[in-house]
UniProtKB/Swiss-Prot annotation:
GO biological process, one term: collagen catabolic process
Catalytic activity, EC: 3.4.24.14
CDD domains assigned to the protein according to its UniProt record, in alphabetical order: ZnMc_ADAMTS_like (cd04273)
Domain of life: Eukaryota
Pathology noted in the entry: Defects in ADAMTS2 are the cause of dermatosparaxis, a recessively inherited disorder characterized by severe skin fragility and biochemically by the presence in skin of procollagen incompletely processed at the N-terminus.
The protein's name in its UniProt record: A disintegrin and metalloproteinase with thrombospondin motifs 2
GO molecular function: metalloendopeptidase activity; zinc ion binding
Gene: ADAMTS2
Cofactors (names): Zn(2+)
Mod. after translation: The N-terminus is blocked. The precursor is cleaved by a furin endopeptidase.
Active site residues of this protein: 403
Classification via Pfam families: ADAMTS_CR_2, ADAMTS_CR_3, ADAMTS_spacer1, Pep_M12B_propep, Reprolysin, TSP1_ADAMTS, TSP_1
Highest classification ranks of the organism: Eukaryota, Metazoa, Chordata, Craniata, Vertebrata
Cofactor binding note of this UniProt entry: Binds 1 zinc ion per subunit.
Organism of origin: Bos taurus
PROSITE patterns: ADAM_MEPRO, PLAC, TSP1
Length: 1205
């Protein structure tokens, strides 16, 4: 993938999955700070003011200061403000009967009267919004779009469009022919205060670039560059833009008969919900999609496409994290598309059945700057019709429109097509995206590519706002003859043209009128499929064929099951599969695909393995010992059971050396046990399938405590005992053995000692806990001998327990530390058939040995204001009153919990608490930001605090993000190649561009002296004029000498830069012209990025000094579309070295611009010899071979002649 481009845009991957990198506003919160309200368009050329809109009647008369909707969308709590009563106001209502609204707003000195109508086609009837919780609970509410409006500006109905939301203030886009405005409230949640003094809004303004702003002005006439020259430069820079705009005007579409409706499922992950807040996120999403809908209504698209919301799902945090894989856009898109497919309603007539899924997230699913990811031409496909979009404010509407454009079949402009000239002017499908609120359009290539595929997207044909359509025949032409279709196309009397028999009637439908049967007409389209074209034949896809059943719309059906394949394991219960295909018949011509799973499985080889200690999961981890390195080292990998039950069919392994748990990024083999706590449920293709102890899939039958399937514990025996020894030697001390088959094993030290417990496998002799040279006193959970063990060391008292069953006998040992006596207690359950007859520690009834005892009180349900807490019970051994595992009290009835009140003190008011500002993200440049934590906390009575929801804090939220270190980075001078010499003979000048650039090729600040940009070039002497012997050639040189008789006017000026006056100033290819004074003034900001105060030297000031030390270099202009006319400074004498002999032709000439003087200067031919200097004013009849100097002389002559008149 190519790296991101510069500030102008981001490169997009040209692969089949297209990703979008788009520079958008840094923030787009609905609750914006007054200092820097985010969300609107920002950057070069953007202006903003504060305005207070008011609601009016149709004639613009004041009705109320309340601009917010009377009701808010479902799920959003806002207090309704009654409209203000205006004394003496009559005539006009708040809204007309059609639901229209009218607002007046004054922006940048212009009074705009907005005429709005409800956008009733953005939210489909029956649409819902779902809030998914962490526990799996879902809250469903109807989705209402009552506060979404579109319309125009009074007086500009044909050239303006408005898309606004008034859920909470006015937010949206006002677009006119010459300029665009983006409006949003300065602060959110103040609807209740609107009636008092109105609501303050921020209005952003940007002029369109279709007409360049006027240049020059009064100061332009004072410079050495004429106003005409500046205007020609402006026109030259606007040629390309005007051409595209004119082509857009030629492409204005006519309203199509068929509307296309994209019914959208909008998925929103938790990062978006948390950023905008649960109170504001729904109306923000509706406003965003309202703008997307308006983008698809732009006339440059050439089709009428409606974006219709049928369902919004706001995901929980856990689900959001599982869908987005950080830094992996391909996998993230696959997860999102799979999720959207699972949300699809099976019935196509369901109100929530969607055609396309749009997923919004603020997580970084790809490299820095990636904004979107989508398949190409996937519309209406059950899995591929989806897009993944990075939400970053209202400008994200262009991300959504761009990615959905890919799904509709549009490619990048300029890549494989001829629309690269529209990229810089805001085409939505540009690879370097320039689209913004102030300018956007669909290129001619996007229009052509859309028309190529749009007719094939049948799912967009249905209208969610109309119902009870009669069922259409599979082939509509079966009911309409060619004569009837001609009448529909051209009017009464028209019939199929029969004058010519040489054409195929199914290729194009030709029609004629009986009054003129030889004049045939066509709309260049074929007849409807199914139209009869010959006896027994019908038109289908442009061909006249026999109509057989296999070409009609056909739903798919499952074929027969294949035989079961081989078993995944040779012993220990494996899985074998069989599959089926949706080919009985295949779905065809828009028919439905098969529903249900394409595979089935059953258990196999359930006999025990010869190696009773074999652990299938352990074997899979061990296979990676030689192949998988972690931390640049090899490890011995042990099995690990994940805490999350959903992850237990994925392979996780634990390093024996470091204890780190690592995901192997793969699923466990089919037939692996889901959990060590369940001996029967198995993993099948990454999912845990419930299996009962009877070996039946889905069975709920379980073993009793000693392993009898469906048993009642009647065959279970409890074995327990205490064993004590005194350490008399170094090394291990054997205590006792626990037999195979033991379950619910508990081994515990009777007293606190410094000894260490150790366990080894009797059959293999391998230690499973605390090998002598590798004692680990830390509490842990580990897998060994096919079961899960829990080891605890609490203040020197060790405990080891497992649910079992043990697959082999273990030996319990102790590593002594000191002389203290060793005492261990043990207890386990075992089936009576496995019990050793010599074991005297068998207890017939152990239920009386344990009891439920009060362990602690639960935490109070509220930190203040009166809460509740309940008793929590634990299992206690009666013998020594020690708390043990609760499983030992399973046979004892648990007492009911006791409730009591707690924390009766009153609650204090929550306040905002801010953290320290983090270091700036950049040391220099234009993107430095620093953030800090902002929390709403509530003080508690015990001098602690707790975090609460932000809605409980009444004050304005403090700023949590601000710009920093916004200054240019240090750079280095970079010089280009020297230009060609300005003359073809004699002495001229050469120039080269010299720019200050940083390492990332942006503008910087250079402390070193700037390298020279101009130098003298000396070519061979110019040929003499030999046609007239009386005339000799002389060389005239301009010098910057002060003439006391002709005082030099002060022409240098300094002015504060007001910003670039053309969007082309940011093109790097034009930066080399910054040395031209006129261009420097036009593009003062781009040419002088390190300094807001731009020196504008429209004409070089004559330096003062002695005549022999002063010389002025005239710049060489190489701009092909720009002619700079510079008048020579008045009163500057000319130096005339005379070329009277050929011997001096090769001598060194110090002049910078040489002109031939084709006439004789009296008295000088014999008296003056080169290189004498003769002060002299240039004659108006001088002629030069240097075309640039000749143009300057001609301009001077014209001005002198005009002065005489």
């Amino acid at each position: 993938m190519d790296p991101p481009a510069g500030a102008a845009g981001r490169l997009l991957c040209p692969a089949l999955l297209l990703l979008l990198l788009l520079p958008l506003p840094a923030d787009a919160r609905l609750a914006a700070a007054a200092a820097d309200p985010p969300g609107g368009p920002q950057g070069h050329g953007a202006e903003r003011i504060l305005a207070v809109p008011v609601r009016t009647d149709a004639q613009g008369r004041l009705v109320s200061h309340v601009v917010s909707a009377a009701t808010a969308p479902a799920g959003v709590r806002t207090r309704r403000a009654a409209p203000a009563q205006i004394p003496g106001l009559s005539g006009g209502s708040e809204e007309d009967p059609g639901g229209r609204l009218f607002y007046n707003v004054t922006v940048f000195g212009r009074d705009l009267h907005l005429r709005l109508r409800p956008n009733a086609r953005l939210v489909a009837p029956g649409a819902t919004v779902e809030w998914q919780g962490e526990s799996g609970a879902t809250r469903v509410e109807p989705l209402l779009g009552t506060c979404l409006y579109v319309g125009d500006v009074a007086g500009l109905a044909e050239s303006s469009s408005v898309a606004l939301s008034n859920c909470d203030g006015l937010a949206g886009l006002i677009r006119m022919e010459e300029e665009e405005f983006f409006i949003e409230p300065l602060e959110k949640g103040l609807a209740a205060k609107e009636a008092e003094q109105g609501r303050v809004h921020v209005v952003y303004h940007r002029p369109t670039t279709s007409r360049p702003p006027p240049l020059g002005g009064p100061q332009a006439l004072d410079t050495g560059i004429s106003a005409d020259s500046l205007d020609s430069l402006s026109r030259a820079l606007g040629v390309l833009e005007e051409r595209v705009n004119s082509s857009r005007r030629r492409m204005r579409r006519h309203a199509a008969d068929d509307d296309y409706n994209i019914e959208v499922l909008l998925g929103v992950d938790d990062s978006v919900v948390q950023f905008h807040g649960t109170e504001h996120v729904q109306k923000y999403l509706l406003t965003l999609m309202n703008i997307v809908n308006e983008i698809y209504h732009d006339e440059s698209l050439g089709a009428h496409i409606n974006v219709v919301l049928v369902r919004i799902i706001l995901l929980s945090y856990g689900k959001s994290m599982s869908l987005i894989e950080i830094g992996n856009p391909s996998q993230s898109l696959e997860n999102v598309c799979r999720w959207a497919y699972l949300q699809q309603k099976p019935d196509t007539d369901h109100d929530e059945y969607h055609d396309h899924a749009i997923f919004l997230t603020r997580q970084d699913f790809g490299p820095s700057g990636m904004q979107g990811y989508a398949p190409v031409t996937g519309m209406c496909h059950p899995v591929r019709s989806c897009t993944l979009n990075h939400e970053d404010g209202f400008s994200s509407a262009f991300v959504v429109a761009h990615e959905t454009g890919h799904v509709l079949g549009m490619e990048h402009d300029g890549q494989g097509n001829r629309c690269g000239d529209e990229v810089r002017l805001g085409s939505i499908m540009a690879p370097l995206v320039q689209a913004a609120f102030h300018r956007f359009h669909w290129s001619r290539c996007s229009q052509q590519e859309l028309s190529r595929y749009l007719h094939s997207y049948d799912c967009l044909r249905d209208d969610p706002f109309t119902h009870d359509w009669p069922a259409l025949p599979q082939l509509p032409g079966l009911h309409y003859s060619m004569n009837e279709q001609c009448r529909f196309d051209f009017g009464l009397g028209y019939m199929m043209c029969t004058a010519f028999r040489t054409f195929d009637p199914c290729k194009q439908l030709w029609c004629s009128h009986p009054d003129n049967p030889y004049f045939c007409k066509t709309k260049k389209g074929p007849p409807l499929d199914g139209t009869m074209c010959a006896p027994g034949k019908h038109c289908f896809k442009g061909h006249c064929i026999w109509l057989t059943p296999d070409i009609l719309k056909r739903d798919g059906n499952w074929g027969a099951w294949s035989p079961f394949g081989s078993c995944s394991r040779t012993c220990g219960t494996g899985v074998k599969f069989r599959t089926r295909q949706c080919d009985n018949p295949h779905p065809a011509n828009g028919g439905r695909t098969c529903s249900g799973l394409a595979y089935d499985f059953q258990l196999c080889n359930s006999q025990d393995c010869p190696d009773a200690l074999a652990d299938f999961r352990e074997e899979q981890c061990r296979q990676w010992d030689l192949y998988f390195e972690h931390g640049d080292a090899q490890h011995h990998w042990l099995p690990h059971e994940h805490r999350d039950a959903k992850e237990r069919c994925h392979l996780y392994c634990e390093s024996k050396e470091t204890g780190e748990v690592v995901s192997m990024k793969r699923m466990v083999h089919d037939g692996t046990r889901c959990s060590y706590k369940d001996a029967f449920s198995l993993c099948v293709r990454g999912d845990c399938r419930k299996v009962g102890c009877d070996g039946v899939i889905g069975s709920s039958k379980q073993e009793d405590k000693c392993g009898v399937c469906g048993g009642d514990n009647s065959h279970c025996k409890v074995v327990k005992g205490t064993f004590s020894r005194s350490p008399k030697k170094l090394g291990y001390i054997k205590m006792f053995e626990i037999p195979a088959g033991a379950r619910h094993l508990l081994i515990q030290e009777a007293d606190t000692t410094s000894h260490h417990l150790a366990v080894k496998n009797l059959e293999t002799g391998k230690f499973i806990l605390n090998e002598e040279n590798d004692v680990d006193p830390n509490s842990k959970t580990f897998i060994a001998m096919g079961v899960e063990w829990e080891y605890r060391d609490e203040d020197g008292r060790e405990t080891l327990q497992t649910m079992g069953p043990l697959h082999g006998t273990i030996t319990v040992l102790v590593i002594p530390e000191g002389d203290a006596r060793i005492s261990l207690t043990y207890k386990y359950m075992i089936h009576e058939d496995s019990l050793n007859v010599d074991d005297n520690n068998v207890l017939e009834d152990d239920s009386v040995g344990y009891e439920w005892a009060l362990k602690k009180w639960s935490p109070c349900s509220k930190p203040c204001g009166g809460g509740s807490q309940f008793t929590k019970y634990g299992c206690r051994r009666r013998l020594d009153h020690k708390m043990v595992h609760r499983g030992f009290c399973d046979s004892v009835s648990k007492p009911k919990a006791i409730r009591r009140t707690c924390n009766p003190q009153e609650c204090s008011q929550p306040v905002w608490v801010t953290g320290e500002w983090e270091p700036c993200s950049r040391s220099c440049g234009r993107t430095g930001m620093q953030v800090r934590s902002v929390r709403c906390v509530q003080p508690l009575h015990n001098n602690t605090t707790r975090s609460v929801h932000t809605k409980h804090c009444n004050d304005a939220r403090p700023e949590g993000r601000r710009a920093c270190n916004r200054e240019l980075c240090p750079g280095r001078w970079r010089a280009g190649s020297w230009s060609q010499c300005s003359v073809t003979c004699g002495n001229g000048t050469q120039e080269r561009p010299v720019l200050c650039r940083t390492a990332d090729d942006s503008f910087g600040v250079c402390r070193e002296e700037r390298p020279e940009t101009a130098r003298i070039c000396r070519l061979g002497p110019c040929p003499r004029n030999t046609s007239d012997p009386s005339k000799k050639s002389y060389v005239v040189q301009w010098l910057s000498r002060p003439d006391p008789n002709s005082p030099v006017q002060e022409t240098s000026s300094k002015g504060r830069c007001q910003g670039d006056k053309s969007v082309f100033c940011r093109m790097e290819v034009l930066s080399r012209y910054c040395s031209i004074p006129g261009y420097n003034k036009l593009c003062c900001k781009s040419c002088n990025p390190h300094d807001n105060l731009t020196d504008v030297d429209d004409r070089a000031e004559p330096p003062s000094g002695k005549h022999n030390d002063i010389e002025e270099l005239m710049p060489t202009l190489s701009v092909p579309t720009l002619v700079m006319e510079v008048q020579p400074p008045p009163g500057i004498p000319l130096e005339v070295p005379l070329n009277t002999s050929s011997t001096n032709a090769t001598e060194d000439h110090p002049e910078t611009n040489a002109v031939d003087v084709p006439y004789k200067i009296p008295g000088l031919e014999d008296e003056v010899q080169p290189p004498n200097l003769i002060p002299r004013r240039p004659s108006p009849y001088e002629k030069t071979r240097n075309q640039r100097i000749q143009e300057l002389i001609d301009e001077m002559r014209k001005k002198e002649m005009l002065g005489k008149f």
